[in-house]
């Protein structure tokens, strides 16, 4: 076997933490990790948030984010320990031998510069190519990555292309200097499932065609299985398991890896609807103030007590806009909302306190949905005071009951949001919504920002609470795995219209319309060769058309 391109030996990384009420102190966040990466191979780094994936990826460039420092070990790239290199050599390494693709291309590109100027910058600055040759290489990469109009797309500004196209432009930026290693840090996590598969296919083919080695960082085992040769499973800064993709997927040895492989094993039987729906959306057409174009077109859906209606579609399909109309934040241009046997005011200001109490919402980003200066007890207690006038011992008793229901317990009552994990924060938001004793809760992408295992726990909790409280859920998501796990009925939205609507079994069974078929076929499956099958099938379909 040839000499590894990269050798990591006993890597240790520390960070400074600032606990509330305590003095800042240093902790170790990566504990003696070792691995090899051969030229032209892809190593997938998998694990939940805080596992150390991105931290290890950045260490391959001798870099650490603010407050993070490499405290021990060796990182060898092309035969030299870069942790012992001089700063000028590290500068040549970054953007030359090793490049980086971040999760958010939109945050990485300069909005004031054209795409081409940014894609070729490192290649020219590193002396790899002249400006003319770098531009020619960039156009070749644009074509390889399946970007439209590859000869001219570089003349656009970042805001003039879609999110998926911009992510592929960032991949072109990373490949332009002809690096030996590319670090892909969650490059498809922020994308819709249909866009994700396009970017994943482009990355897979670009890696194969250029022969570059890669670290592919993600929390989605089904995704990493499609692009990697080997997988390293990380947890709390420790390596849990390391081996070929086939072994990790089909015969995992460690309990944590087995849990990752079996995630989303929830089974939810579709329930028969009750005679009267709790929510009826009738002929809703809406547009945003100051615009001339409708963003919702004649939308009709029903939601029954104790059931879950999943509203699914890509970004811009109208899912969250529908939620804004239902909650009164966006008055519709046409149509009406019937809720619990009455017609709701189209404007939030015209709704009664009872309307507000019975219709609650849980948001995607729990971080920004809670006051960081309030304790968990205060956050959950506010609806109890506002809607029911609870005080003192009565309120405290109910808060503890709600904390028990969300499986946190009384010990969390005096904690602040900063002291909670992502999953714990979302559980607190669920408890706050339940405190109002609603008939219906809108869940807007409530698991999309969470790791698979944490998200799995949240979904199981919601289903259990639904049985207890008989609350209806309008569940907005772009994740088809989530839809299969929890829904009774499904509305597939596309460009502001309901494309397909009905019971879960009906919607997820053929024959499909083209868009629903595209959505379903784009959900990564946890088996080897799935991506190659999708690529081959779509090329055949494209040739046939």
Regions inferred by a protein language model and the residue ranges of each:
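ABC ATPase NBD coupling module
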Residues: 22, 69, 82-99, 125, ...
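Conserved ABC ATPase "signature" region
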Residues: 133-152, 393-411, 520
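Helix-to-loop junction immediately C-terminal to a conserved catalytic motif
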Residues: 61, 65, 327
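Conserved catalytic motifs of ABC-family nucleotide-binding domains
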Residues: 178, 437
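Conserved ABC ATPase signature
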Residues: 156-161, 165, 416-420, 424
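Conserved ABC transporter NBD signature motif
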Residues: 69-81, 335-346
